[in-house]
Every structure is written in structure tokens, then in C-alpha cells.
Swiss-Prot record:
Family per similarity comment: Belongs to the DapA family.
Broad enzyme group: lyase
Keyword field contains RNA-binding: no
Gene Ontology terms: cellular component: cytosol
Signal peptide start-end: none
Pfam families xref list: DHDPS
The name this protein goes by in its record: 4-hydroxy-tetrahydrodipicolinate synthase
CDD domains membership: DHDPS (cd00950)
Annotated site residue numbers, Part of a proton relay during catalysis: 46, 109
Length: 294
């Protein structure tokens, strides 16, 4: 079995204009990503503001991306919730629309234990019969998929990968010891740790910053064996990432997707936009980064 993808998958931001999904901007953004060597597109995840998208919007966004991508790279749909059976329904619908895989966040608020996590994920996987990427992001859910649990879940034929947003390399190493790395992929959920993640054997990243610098971020993966080269290449990206840490994702990255012309600079409540001075700071950091690349 081969991995779902190797390298950079983009956690796609949802463009808005006047608080409506801007499908024209969405199509142009996806085409930009496809033209710049992206290996997968993840829709309806954290960066997409999925909690404030209606089911109809999620389905239409997914259908738009699936049609445009036309099997050139995997399209992965975020369908996980803290309701197992709603997650099944959303995943089945994503499969019908044409998603190549689903990404499932850990249940939140109605937290469970590790035994409950195993049953939750396996129930969805066995019912939907589509490749599943587990999504571990304890900073948002206050729930961790323990390494032993990942190991158990990795034996399910439909559960094929983990998006690890812990930024904890002890956790990464423990997970890696418990999986068959030829069949189960490990993707970083943190743009700022990708160099180290690749050096320790990670298979790629589900990236926020690749919304705006897809080719540059894929280069880091392509050159991962050249430690000196990618360490130096990553330094200006780190500076841009610092500017993108002014607020929670996706508030800062949408400054730049709007700057590139993909929708207006809008987020949906309860998220609020950056202040004007902060927006200029993010734009200036991006301009300096691009100037340095020329």
C-alpha cells in the first residue's frame, strides 16, 4: 500500500465575499495550488472555518474542489465531529461527492477515553469504507490520541494516516515505533516544525502557509535529504510564520489569501479580523519574503 500523499497537502482556506462563500475565488485559488506542485488538498478543516460553514456550503465547496482537481491529487474532506453518527453521515456524503479520503478530528467537549476513541474512529471507518486520516490537535480539543491508540487504529485497513498537530517529538517518536511506516503515514499539522518532522521520518505536512507559498513549501519536502539546504531555505519562511502567529488560524492567513485576490479579507464570527496595523504587518512580511525569493 502506498501513502495517501507525500509532501505538502494544503489545508484550504474558504474565501468569503460579503459573508458568502466566493466560489469564483475558490476555483482560482485551487487552480493556483495545482499549478504550484501541491500534493493534496484538504477541505472543510480548521483553516476552512468548518464550524461556521453550513452542511450545504461544505458539500458545495467539496464538490467544487473535486470537480476542479479531477483526480490529479487527493481531495481529503474534514468530516469529523464529536458525534460519531453525524460524522458517519458527513463522511458518506463526502464519499458520494467524490472525496478520496476523510480527516477525522478527535471528539471534543463530550470527551471520551482511549477505548471510546478506538470505537469512534473504527465505527466511522468500517461504515464509510474510505481512507481515514486521524487528526490529533489537543490544543483545540483538549483530547489526545495516545501513541498506543494510534498503533491499534493503524491496523484497521481504512485508517491510513495521522495528522499530528501536537508539536511534540517525543509523541511523534512513540507513534512511529507503533506503526508500520510503509503503510501508515505521519503528517505534521504544524508548519513551523516541518524541517525537523521530515528529518525524523515524517511523510509530509497538512499546511496552512502553503495556501500562499505552495511551491516554496513543497521544495522543503523535495530537498529534505539536504539538511543544510533546507535549514537555510526555511529561515525566511520562519519569519513569515512569525507574522502569521499574530492570532489563531485562519485569521492571519486569510489576510494573505485576500492579498493574492482570493476573496475579501473576511472571517466568520466568533472569529474577528486582525486590526488594520496587524494586517499591514502580515502583508509586509509576505512582501519581504517574496522579494527575498526573487
Amino acid at each position: 500500500m502506498t501513502h495517501m500523499f507525500e509532501g505538502v497537502g494544503v489545508a484550504l482556506a474558504t474565501p468569503f465575499t460579503n459573508n458568502e462563500v466566493d466560489f469564483n475565488a475558490l476555483e482560482r485559488h485551487v487552480q493556483f495550488l495545482l499549478n504550484n506542485n501541491i500534493q493534496a488538498i484538504i477541505v472543510n478543516g480548521t483553516t476552512a472555518e468548518s464550524p461556521t460553514l453550513s452542511d450545504e456550503e461544505k458539500e458545495k465547496v467539496l464538490a467544487t474542489v473535486v470537480k476542479l482537481v479531477n483526480h490529479s491529487v487527493p481531495v481529503i474532506a474534514g468530516t469529523g465531529t464529536n458525534n460519531t453518527y453525524k460524522s458517519i453521515q458527513a463522511s458518506i456524503r463526502a464519499k458520494e461527492i467524490g472525496a478520496d479520503a476523510v480527516m477525522l478530528i478527535t471528539p471534543y467537549y463530550n470527551k471520551t477515553n482511549q477505548r471510546g476513541l478506538i470505537q469512534h474512529f473504527e465505527t466511522i471507518a468500517n461504515e464509510v469504507k474510505l481512507p481515514v486520516i486521524l487528526y490529533n490537535v489537543p490544543s483545540r480539543t483538549n483530547m489526545t490520541i495516545e501513541p498506543e491508540t494510534v498503533g491499534i487504529l493503524s491496523h484497521n485497513p481504512y485508517i491510513v494516516a495521522l495528522k499530528d498537530a501536537t508539536n511534540d517529538f517525543d509523541y511523534f517518536d512513540q507513534v512511529k515505533q507503533r506503526i508500520n511506516t510503509n503503510e501508515f503515514a505521519l503528517y505534521s499539522g504544524n508548519d513551523d516544525n516541518v524541517v525537523k518532522f521530515y528529518q525524523r521520518g515524517g511523510n509530509g505536512v497538512i499546511s496552512v502557509i502553503a495556501n500562499v507559498i505552495p511551491q516554496e513549501f513543497q521544495y522543503l519536502y523535495d530537498q529534505r535529504q539536504n539538511e543544510t539546504d533546507i535549514t537555510n531555505y526555511f529561515k525566511p519562511i520562519e519569519k513569515l510564520l512569525e507574522a502569521l502567529s499574530l492570532d489563531v488560524n485562519p485569521i492571519p492567513i486569510k489576510v494573505l489569501t485576500a492579498y493574492l485576490g482570493y476573496g475579501h479579507y473576511e472571517v466568520r464570527l466568533p472569529l474577528v479580523p486582525l486590526e488594520e496595523a496587524q494586517c499591514k504587518q502580515v502583508e509586509r512580511a509576505f512582501e519581504q519574503f517574496k522579494a527575498g525569493e526573487q
